[in-house]
From Swiss-Prot:
The active site is at D155. Belongs to the class I-like SAM-binding methyltransferase superfamily. TrmB family. This is tRNA (guanine-N(7)-)-methyltransferase. It is found in: Nucleus. Residues 17-45 are annotated as: Disordered. It holds the Pfam family Methyltransf_4. GO terms for cellular component: nucleus; tRNA methyltransferase complex. The gene is metl-1.
Length: 256
């Protein structure tokens, strides 16, 4: 059977996280509603400032000489993180997830993968924390700390009165611009055309972001991972749905 290099690479990407790894949690025990109200009181602990954040609780001594610089916002069951981790072993990456059971699942999965690959030291660069990124992003990250931020299949909040709850808004984009370094990248993808247009509109109108061209997107190896790495993306594929990516670059601050 003829197998293309792209397919072989995809199989290799998924091999380390397959169900044959001992101790992997079963997703059926960690099911929770697809989205959570970001404005509810979730009793979440968070650091007073980034200086109060102890990342060694998540990465151990792997933090030596490193800072977290990839952030997957609303990481779900961690599919993208598991794809990114072995490809970018020198980058610390964090998944931020508001749902308790889902973040517990991702943590258990990471611990199982670390144990299984202990000799090689794989997956030490990935972690998850339960938090509300819409409220506490600046509490975790210093100015210009992040190089990449991911927003994959976020809650569309269809009703007009709930659009203010969307993860991409003018106010939130200013916070993202604060923690994202110049030249850093925001990756978005959704299966909801209206939400795609909303995100593109607000990112395009913000003075600190510019959209990547089609040619630039083709050269970025991460872009292809956005489509199928997550459970939500795979579900959209099974249902023959459309997917719309939009990638933006953080521009330099304007001269004073």
């Amino acid at each position: 059977m003829d197998i293309t290099p792209a397919l072989t690479e995809m199989e290799l990407d998924h091999k380390p996280t397959c169900e044959t790894v001992p101790g992997l949690p079963q997703k059926k025990h960690y099911r929770q509603r697809a989205h959570s109200n970001p404005h509810s009181d979730h009793d979440i602990e968070y650091p007073l400032t980034p200086n109060h954040m102890d990342w060694t609780k998540y990465y151990g001594d792997y933090t030596k000489g490193r800072q977290v610089d990839f952030a997957d916002i609303g990481c779900g069951y961690g599919g993208l993180l598991m794809r990114l981790s072995p490809k970018y072993p020198d980058n610390l990456m964090i998944g931020m997830e508001i749902r308790v059971k889902v973040s517990d699942y991702v943590n258990e999965k990471i611990q199982a993968l670390r144990k299984h690959h202990a000799e090689a030291g794989h997956y030490r660069n990935v972690a998850v924390l339960r938090s509300n990124a819409m409220k506490y992003m600046p509490n975790y990250f210093h100015k210009g700390q992040l190089s990449k931020m991911f927003f994959l299949f976020p809650d569309p909040h269809f009703k007009n009165k709930k659009h203010k709850w969307r993860i991409i808004t003018p106010t939130l984009l200013s916070e993202y611009a604060y923690v994202l370094r110049e030249g850093g990248i925001i990756y978005t993808i959704t299966d909801v055309k209206d939400l795609h247009e909303w995100m593109v509109k607000h990112l395009s109108e913000h003075p600190l972001f510019e959209r990547l061209t089609e040619e630039e997107m083709k050269k970025d190896p991460i872009v292809e991972m956005l489509f199928e790495s997550t459970e939500e993306g795979q579900k959209v594929t099974r249902n023959d749905g459309g997917k719309w990516p939009a990638i933006f670059r953080r521009l330099p601050n304007p001269a004073l």
